């Protein structure tokens, strides 16, 4: 006779009827699974004095091992079994305690921020919780929720159930609304039904004592030692609280440049990037993973050749940074020179720093002037040779990422207020940034303080005229001896990404988009005000432009369920129609919020203020892909233009399509805008390998789930170009190639097409060998956790 050790330590005979209750509930109303098969295969692994915990884990593992292409519903069986165990751990029974009990327990354990639950009617909201929505999770989804998002106590014991998590997030983000109960319920309904989802930092941290809700940050480094090391401090603080980082180093003078009038004194950008690499390692993200920093460099910078080799395994290790993610900021003129097989001139930003402030025709005019100036230090390289080197590295290592400077800035709705200098780690965010500006602070012996620009000419009492940054304590100004002269910073701009994604597999009709998009735009706008900011600068920037990034996920599932082939005319027309609706309702909601809560500070003179929307600045070649005339749009764009001119806009930036692997897994849909990798693969987890099958795989969808490696990469680019027409920021776009199909010409054609069609960036180049491994594990080690 087999005996069982219960959770309280008591030993009693195995009662199979108790197991049957769980297995029946776990298999009910699911096709292709069998209660008896689950019980028989699990019992083969039972032993005397097995614990109830071990029985539960055995049942779960038995179900997981049965997940396959022809039996995908075993994933839901495993999920239900996991949930029953989770209920017992959190509640002590199969069900939910009252919302008030949940809050009091989590507050007592120091896991939930005190003070916001009192703004709500807990009885009402508790009555609106829908425990049955837990059964939407497949196994990998509920495991991901448990491992990454559910709150746990100091002993790593779970104290939160899924619907309590969604409700508490909704409440946290609705706490400042005039009707908090109504808005919290709207947020809860959308999140808990998987119609849309916040990005990882918001899911993990909203409701907690450290409510850092933003995904990543984008900044820029000035060309002085104070500014460079201030940048490291800023990166460290941002990384400490879990933010991914994109950082522009294009202003830092090149190797061989002048320092204090001495030529060949500078070691260039690479040694400073090496320190940034060490920051990424030393300041890990809350002890869970090393920091993630993408570094950007303009393609005319003299250090560009070394920059491309930044992660090479060969060469001088002192000039390598293996943990950074290099990205090139590519201007139109360079790619024109590539196509013309012309020479490309590299400059030192110490002499040509205004090139970082210009784009388009203004950039080209100034660049040509510098080329003709004999006094300017320059180097020459054949543009095509440099392009080949970039593409070769891209193929071998998936890096450097490419971002197109002119495409980004031409479509910047806030070009009046600055310039876009780089993107973020995942290359979908495009916002104005600016490095810190440094002044000379002159403190006199009497305690008085005066400020000068660094290069401002100052005449001392000795009748000597010098730059303010050369003043010392030996100087006297207007009869006042100088006590000390120090360089101080005035904050620049560090941009912030606040992200969420609409689930296209559930929300793909005009009616649903009109309902869900306004809720998510409001939710993201509230993130800005309720966020914990690691420093003053990022808060000031975020409150200045109130940038959000609403994106989409589940495109491949939506296409398969509508029986639309990837890359087909129907595909382009479908996403064109969907993105038009999403763009329209996002802009409309921001205009409504502007009337309700006020406009963002930089609205005046923005493109929005002139009634100019992303579609109005869309790439001409991209417009031809769907052959939709100016008057064939489904939405009342002219009416919306007048509304925006009248109301203003709440948000300076609105839309961006991020990679969504974590939240896509959570809600059981396909990742972001990408095709699938395979119909079945394995995800690596703390519990081992978990088999995963694409969602809703059946006879009707089978032929419409096509691997990304079996789709022409140019079709991926064209689909991205259609989406981009409606987006004010960008998209995280991976390119997929089978190794046997890769060539220099193929890569050239793909990336020049991306540029010509108006894309702002490309992310990883992923290559795969033709051999198919049935046990293939999807490598997510290179993915940005925060944008997901």
PLM features: residue spans?
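A glycine-rich phosphate-binding loop feature that marks nucleotide/adenosyl-phosphate handling sites
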Residues: 41-42, 60-63, 78-84, 190, ...
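Catalytic alpha/beta core of large soluble enzyme barrels
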Residues: 118-124, 130-144, 430-431, 524, ...
């Amino acid at each position: 006779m087999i005996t069982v050790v219960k959770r309280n330590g008591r030993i009693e005979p195995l009662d199979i009827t108790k197991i049957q209750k769980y297995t029946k509930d776990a298999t009910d109303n699911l096709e292709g699974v069998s209660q008896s098969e689950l019980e028989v295969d699990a019992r083969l692994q039972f032993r005397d004095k097995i614990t109830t915990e071990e029985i539960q884990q055995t049942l779960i593992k038995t179900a997981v091992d049965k997940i396959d292409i022809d039996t995908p519903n075993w994933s839901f069986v495993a999920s239900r079994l996991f949930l029953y165990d989770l209920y017992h751990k959190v509640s002590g029974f199969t069900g939910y305690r009252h919302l008030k009990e949940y809050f009091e327990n989590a507050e007592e354990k120091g896991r939930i921020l005190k003070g916001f639950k009192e703004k709500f009617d807990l009885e009402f909201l508790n009555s609106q919780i829908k425990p049955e929505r837990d059964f939407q999770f497949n196994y990998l989804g509920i495991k991901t929720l448990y491992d990454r998002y559910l709150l746990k106590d100091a002993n790593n014991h779970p104290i939160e159930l899924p619907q309590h998590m969604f409700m508490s997030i909704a409440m946290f983000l609705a706490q400042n609304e005039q009707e908090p109960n109504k808005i919290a319920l709207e947020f809860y309904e959308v999140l808990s039904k998987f119609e849309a989802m916040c990005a990882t930092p918001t899911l993990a941290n909203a409701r907690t004592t450290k409510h850092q809700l933003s995904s990543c940050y984008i900044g820029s480094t000035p060309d002085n030692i104070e500014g460079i090391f201030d940048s490291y401090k800023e990166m460290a603080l941002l990384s400490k609280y879990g933010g991914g980082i994109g950082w522009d180093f294009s202003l830092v003078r090149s190797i061989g440049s002048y320092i204090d009038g001495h030529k060949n004194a500078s070691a260039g950008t690479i040694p400073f990037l090496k320190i940034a690499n060490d920051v990424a390692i030393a300041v890990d993200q809350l002890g869970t993973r090393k920091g993630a920093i993408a570094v950007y460099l303009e393609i005319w910078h003299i250090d560009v050749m070394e920059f491309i080799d930044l992660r090479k395994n060969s060469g001088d290790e002192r000039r390598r940074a293996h943990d950074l993610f290099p990205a090139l900021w590519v201007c139109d003129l360079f790619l024109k020179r590539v196509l013309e097989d012309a020479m490309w001139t590299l400059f030192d930003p110490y002499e040509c720093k205004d090139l970082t402030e210009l784009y388009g025709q203004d950039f080209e005019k100034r660049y040509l002037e510098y080329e003709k100036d004999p006094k300017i230090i320059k180097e020459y390289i054949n543009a095509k040779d440099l392009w080949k080197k970039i593409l070769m590295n891209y193929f071998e290592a998936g890096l450097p990422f490419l971002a197109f400077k002119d495409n980004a800035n031409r479509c910047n709705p806030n070009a009046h207020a600055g310039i876009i200098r780089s993107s973020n780690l995942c290359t979908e965010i495009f916002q104005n940034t600016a490095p810190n500006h440094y002044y000379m602070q002159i403190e006199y012996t009497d305690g008085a303080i005066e400020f000068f620009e660094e290069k401002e000419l100052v005449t001392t009492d000795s009748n000597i005229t010098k730059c303010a940054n050369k003043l010392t304590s030996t100087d006297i100004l207007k009869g006042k001896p100088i006590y000390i002269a120090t360089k101080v910073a005035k904050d620049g701009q560090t941009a912030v990404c606040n992200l969420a994604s609409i689930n296209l597999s559930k929300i793909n009709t005009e009616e649903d988009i009109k309902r869900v998009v306004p809720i998510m735009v409001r939710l993201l706008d509230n993130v800005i005000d309720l966020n914990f900011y690691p420093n003053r600068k990022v808060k000031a920037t975020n409150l200045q432009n109130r940038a959000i990034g609403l994106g989409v996920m589940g495109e491949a599932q939506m296409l398969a369920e509508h029986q639309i082939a990837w890359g087909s005319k129907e595909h382009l027309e479908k996403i064109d129609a969907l993105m038009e609706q999403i763009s329209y309702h996002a802009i409309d909601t921001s205009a409504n919020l502007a009337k309700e809560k006020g406009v963002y500070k930089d609205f005046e003179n923005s493109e929005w203020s002139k009634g100019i929307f992303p579609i109005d600045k869309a790439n001409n070649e991209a417009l031809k892909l769907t052959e939709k005339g100016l008057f064939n749009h489904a939405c009342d764009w002219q009416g919306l233009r007048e509304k925006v001119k009248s109301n203003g806009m709440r948000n300076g930036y609105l839309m961006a399509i991020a990679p969504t692997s974590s939240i896509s897994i959570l809600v059981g849909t396909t990742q972001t805008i990408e095709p699938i990798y395979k119909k079945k693969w394995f995800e690596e987890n703390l519990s081992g390998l978990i088999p995963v099958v694409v969602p809703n795989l059946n006879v009707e969808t089978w032929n419409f789930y096509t691997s990304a490696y079996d789709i022409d990469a140019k079709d991926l680019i064209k689909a991205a170009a259609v989406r981009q027409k409606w987006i004010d920021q960008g998209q995280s776009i991976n390119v997929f190639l089978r190794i046997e199909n890769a060539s220099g010409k193929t890569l050239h054609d793909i990336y020049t097409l991306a540029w010509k069609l108006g894309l702002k960036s490309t992310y990883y180049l992923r290559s795969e060998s033709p051999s198919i491994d049935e046990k293939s594990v999807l490598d997510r080690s290179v993915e940005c956790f925060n944008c997901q």
